[in-house]
Amino acid sequence: MIDPSSSEEEGEDDAVPNVSSKGRLTNTTKGTSAVSIIGGSAGSVVGSNIPVSGSNTDLIGNQRQSNISSICNRNDVGNISVAALGSTSNKIEQICGNRADTGNLEVPSNGIPSGISQETLNQSVGSSRANSLPRPLSPSPSLTSEKHETAEPHGKHEREEEERKRRIQLYVFISRCISYPFNAKQPTDMTKRQTKISKQQLEIITQRFQAFLKGETQIMADEAFQNAVQSYHDVFLKSERVLKMVQSGASSQHDFREVFRNNIEKRVRSLPEIDGLSKETVLTSWMAKFDIILKGTGEEDSKRPSRMQQSLNSELILSKEQLYDMFQQILLVKKFEHQILFNALMLDSADEQAAAIRRELDGRMQRVGEMEKNRKLMPKFVLKEMESLYVEELKSSINLLMANLESLPVSKGNMDSKYGLQKLKRYNHSTPSFLKLILRSHGSLSKLEGDSEDGSTQLTKLDVVLTFQLEVIVMEVENGEKLQTDQAEASKPMWDTQGDFTTTHPLPVVKVKLYTENPGMLALEDKELGKVTLKPTPLSSKSPEWHRMIVPKNLPDQDIRIKIACRLDKPLNMKHCGYLYAIGKSVWKKWKRRYFVLVQVSQYTFAMCSYKEKKSEPSEMMQLDGYTVDYIEAASANLMFGIDLNGGRYFFNAVREGDSISFACDDENECSLWVMAMYRATGQSHKPTPPITQDKNSAMSKIQGDADKARKHGMEDFISTDPCTFDHATLFKTLQNLTLEYRLNDPYASLGWFSPGQVFVLDEYCARYGVRGCYRHLCYLSDLLDRAEKQHMIDPTLIHYSFAFCASHVHGNRPDGVGSITHEEKEKFSEIKERLRQLLEFQITNFRYCFPFGRPEGALKATLSLLERVLMKDIVTPVPPEEVRQMIKKSLETAALVNYTRLSNKAKIDEDLRGDVIVPAPKKLEDLIHLAELCVDLLQQNEEHYGEAFAWFSDLLVEHAEIFWSLFAVDMDRVLSEQAPDTWDSFPLFQILNDYLRTDDNLRNGRFHQHLRDTFAPLVVRYVDLMESSIAQSIHKGFEKERWESKGINAALNPAALNNAAQALNTAALNPSMILCGKKDQVNFYVPKLPKQSNSTAANDEMRNGCATSEDLFWKLDALQSFIRDLHWPDAEFRQHLEQRLKMMAVDMIEQCIQRTDSSFQSWLKKNIAFISTDYILPSEMCAMVNVILDAKNQSFKLTTIDGIDLYKFHAKIDDQIDKANVAMTQGLSGKLMSVLESTLSKLARYDEGSLIGSILSFTNVSSSGKDLGQGYVNFFRNNMDQVRGKIADDLWTLHFFEQWYSQQINMLCNWLSERVDHALHYAQVASISHIIKKIYSDFELQGVLEDKLNSKAYQAVAQRMATEEATCALTMPDACEDEPCDEIREGEEEDNGDESTSNIPRGLPKPKVAAAQAAAVTNVVAGRVGNLLGKGIGGLSSKLGSGSWF
């Protein structure tokens, strides 16, 4: 990612300390003290080799403030005190760099093409440039034309060697950017990238999910989660598109997780609410289980190699070592090559790197000057006026780099000085004319303002005051114990085990005195035992050394030695120090040895100062502006000043126009260090080379050794080359391309975004070496498009950023402050724009395969947004919406063909229709149905995963679907045309398509939906016609052969069978081919196979629901209506027509069924009319007929109404016919049964008074008691009650029938008794009717007849009459009645034993108590009867007597 904030002036903390995070200039003083305390052995004396200056003044004698601290130590001799005296200055003048008035350094972004931001994309747009000029060769602002191009090597080895050299040279520039950055920083606000999934990891993940589905894991899951995982595995993980997404490097575990989460969210949301369990809890639980399956045990992470682990850290903020390592891998630089370059370039030296930057910037400024004079060196611009603008922009960019460099702090106190970069009028521009061919002056910001010497500001002595940290540690006294401090008495410096001083003296004098404590109470001072004077410098030894103390002459012990460690730290702004011989024309006019310090006031200001002991200000100083340093011979120095310079062996000088200074020292290494330090300070391009005459055995510096090592390995040219001579734009193009290749191959799904470390280095390179921002982004776009065209997944948002930057620049909007536009940039942009347009068109056309399952998230939406941006003519005028729509419409039309072609190939429909092998028609239809399912899935996925992205173009997505279906319609019509006539295997195809289309608001009643209706409407009509004919034939033939066996109740009562029947009906409705045969004029239903019945089910097999023909009829009618209803015919008018026709058909068929059943019932009623006895039982056939009528009544409501509403009044009509048939059958059955009672009563009538037959029967005692006749009738109605209850399914009808039958029987008995109200009944009549009355009441009560129906007035009258008759019999015929108790007992036994025959049971003797009770009851009845007779009068009595006698 190109970070918008990468141009801020911030450096690495370890390279440049104390840099404010917001670019604020801070004043720091470096002087921390770190001391090593070493206990030395007694007697060892180490001498000091520190050169001593001429001043030996005692520290106490200094007029500046001094503090004396006393440290009390104990040893065997007595109490000894050691005092150290440190010099401090009252006031330290701090040297500060330039500070902005507000305290914050605001750095403009002009000229630093380090990135783009959101503000860049939203900037106001200037007018576009219409003119154009010829295309230049390069946009790089380099002076050299780079026209020399080496001929292409002919051998592979030579080409590889050239490429290796190019990469090493590039690595040299990169390593300098890493070691000392001053423009960019590593961004911390970039989006964290997820680790991508490789092909091998995809296989492992798939295996984990397969193991879960097989139950091989320990993860507990319910069936719903199992189904969700199964769907995820089949649809997503096994998809070819997911494999391609993995191969493109765009998929991460986050993507896999999000796809599953989106799927289960829809599933869980559709589930019903469960009390106590929220759907959020279910989602969380499912996602936790999914994560366990997806990530496995985690053992793979522990086995990851270290190199891969290092790559995984690339998303973090990287250290310099990690950045070096990363770009070694990018540029294929070996480790030892890096080490050689690191040492030779002195990458660990901030001074050397800052000096190199100053030389580079000076060189670039000179090239700008040459370009200004020679316009042919410039690239060609679209407008001639841009040449001057280009020069100003180059100067501005260089000045900005200088400002960035100047903003880096050197040490405390230099940022607020009036000698900051902005106020320096001249710096190193005064070059002697004889050196101009060799040396290069160093440019500065003020050079553009003028070269007036008068306006230059000179340094004062206060500006170069240094601050030193001084540490003094007293270790031990010889021949005594090691000293320990146990109290401190002085305030400053505070002594503990050491004394810390702050001083501004480069040459301080430290005096340490040893005292013995005076034990006297009134003693004023301690006795001095000895003292030692130290003169430390920053170059002095830091280790403890023994010193001989100066002892007063009056002490007996004249040899006291003390071990002291004295350390003087070197401030950061002191670059070098030491003793030199010097002579100059304006300063140091006398040749003598002085103590010199090279002071850095700011990044561009250095001073050479000489100091005396105990002085904080320099005695003399020289500002190094414009000087050039180099080695010289002693003879040259003598000749230059005309005197014999005695002292010093190794000479060097600093020269500028009108001035020259010579220096000398006694050590060769010291001479080299001074020259290198001054070389960095002057900023000269010429690097001094030591004279060859120097002693080879002398200890040369490490720098020279590193240079020799680099020369040995052939890297000297890479190190010493001038960066200004390179075309950095071309080098950067290579660097960016290699970095992108490395990034796309790292473990992260970067989508082309660079890591923070890569962004930082690229930003720093562009800023430091002047790579134009537009060129950078154009190269980036070209590289990204190359990868995208090779099926790498590149984030369209990233392309959008770079494209918007380039478009803004080309149209003159200055996103980075650069207004000049080269001809090459404009042409390159046009080329990129066309390539990008073609790529976007391809991606939108193949959106399902470029963005599988809508991943990466938001990519398609960003692609459409980018397309709109690309189609804009300029940055101001928005593109017409119709143009964007036309482009997307064209792409989606092509996408429909692409998607359908791939699906049809997958379903092999092309092979079926256009292949060489002849495929049977059913196989073609099967493949077509499979293709339809795939098409529905595809369009549902489009809506689910891509609908949101196409929200602004939803109508185009609908049109895409219509075109897609139109392609399918061509194959569908061809396959259907090849099917045999009157086959119904194609109805599942209609249901699949129609069920999808009718639920889609956009496609419902669309073009394809209308075509589907038109195609299948004739098939539906033909199917209904054939079904109607088939049902009519089945009724006609079925009733002719009907055996009237009950069917269906068992299936209705058995839940297992009911479930199976429901499944069979659903199957039949969904696939009519299973229920219809292929005959042209006859259609037979497929009868589902019922499950095997259990014993208990088989025992109730007689309980049925109708006959075979009626069951078949009702099942067919219901299946046909269900099938047509489940078609969900989209056309409301045709759907209503079908409904009306099917309801009318049902009415007609049921009516025929009723008529045929009623006709058969009437014929059965006429059978056995001649002989009706108590042995008669209703035939099961008649019961079956009743069941048919009852079932017809139940079925008619469902078959003739629409959702329970009698819309067409069909139900009322058929229900009336059913009721009539039902009434007729009920009457027929009851009449048949009542004829038996009538026959029984006619037999009992033979015993009437005055009947000859009755008298004979009574006299002969043939009739016994008459009970057998009554018992026979009881057996009759019991048997028929069981028959009706067992054979007729409707319990309500049965109850109603029993109530009616009971009422008819009671009424008939009542009428029969009423006819004999004036006559006494024969005891046989009494016995029979009394038995019937008792049993009929109890038995019908058991069948569910209610009390109010049973205990009717007729029954009460009969019961009362029979009680009277029984009493009369008991009085008049006691012998006959004596057997009654026995009969009652026997009847009870018969009830218990279930025995219906009583004729062979012997009579028993009466019980005395029962007889007595019976006699009392009879007496009462007779008394009442006699009273009744008397009350009727004489006429009544005479009529009784006259009509016959009981005897």
Swiss-Prot record:
Protein's name in the database: Calcium-dependent secretion activator
PANTHER family per record: CALCIUM-DEPENDENT SECRETION ACTIVATOR (PTHR12166:SF8)
A Pfam family reported for this protein in Swiss-Prot or TrEMBL: C2_CAPS
The PH domain, residue ranges: 573-683
Biased segments, Basic and acidic residues type: 145-163
One Gene Ontology biological process: synaptic transmission, glutamatergic
Name of the encoding gene: Cadps
MHD1 domain boundaries: 970-1157
Cellular location(s): Cytoplasmic vesicle membrane; Synapse
Deletion consequences: Flies display locomotory deficits and complete embryonic lethality. The mutant NMJ reveals a 50% loss in evoked glutamatergic transmission, and an accumulation of synaptic vesicles at active zones. They also display a 3-fold accumulation of DCVs in synaptic terminals.
Single GO cellular component term: synapse
Residue spans of biased composition, Polar residues class: 18-32, 111-126
Cystine bridges: none
Keyword line: Calcium, Cytoplasmic vesicle, Exocytosis, Lipid-binding, Membrane, Metal-binding, Protein transport, Synapse, Transport
Organism of derivation: Drosophila melanogaster
Signal peptide location: none
Domain C2: start-end pairs: 417-547
Gene Ontology terms for molecular function: calcium ion binding; lipid binding
PROSITE patterns recorded: C2, MHD1, PH_DOMAIN
Entry text on domains: The PH domain is essential for regulated exocytosis and binds phospholipids.
Gene3D superfamilies: Pleckstrin-homology domain (PH domain)/Phosphotyrosine-binding domain (PTB)
Signal as UniProt keyword: no
Tissue: Restricted to the nervous system at all stages of development and highly localized at synapses (at protein level).
Primary residence: membrane
